[in-house]
């Protein structure tokens, strides 16, 4: 299991996704953490807009964040699969 998800990771997602132009929403406690709620959670939950350009930007942003995506995982993100769990990066993330 990756380290607990905290504000620094939320800010890093925000910054890297902005740099890649990814359209997304933080969901659940990860969103509250980014807004300053003083807590941690086990992972981040994000809703990513399901367009082809956004999906490709998401794959690149995740790799920049340090996620080691298999070809199958990258393909799931690119095709807009409804639920993708990633446990192969600096923290756990659900898309």
Describe the role of every protein-language-model region.
Residues 1-95:
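Compositionally biased terminal segments of proteins
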């Amino acid at each position: 299991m990756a380290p607990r998800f905290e504000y620094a990771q939320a800010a890093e997602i925000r910054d890297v996704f902005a740099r890649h132009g990814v359209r997304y929403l933080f969901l659940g406690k990860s969103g509250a953490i980014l807004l300053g709620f003083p807590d941690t959670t086990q992972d981040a939950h994000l809703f990513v807009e399901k367009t082809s350009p956004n999906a490709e930007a998401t794959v690149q942003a995740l790799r920049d964040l340090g996620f080691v995506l298999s070809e199958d995982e990258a393909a799931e993100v690119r095709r807009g699969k409804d639920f993708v769990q990633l446990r192969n990066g600096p923290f756990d993330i659900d898309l």
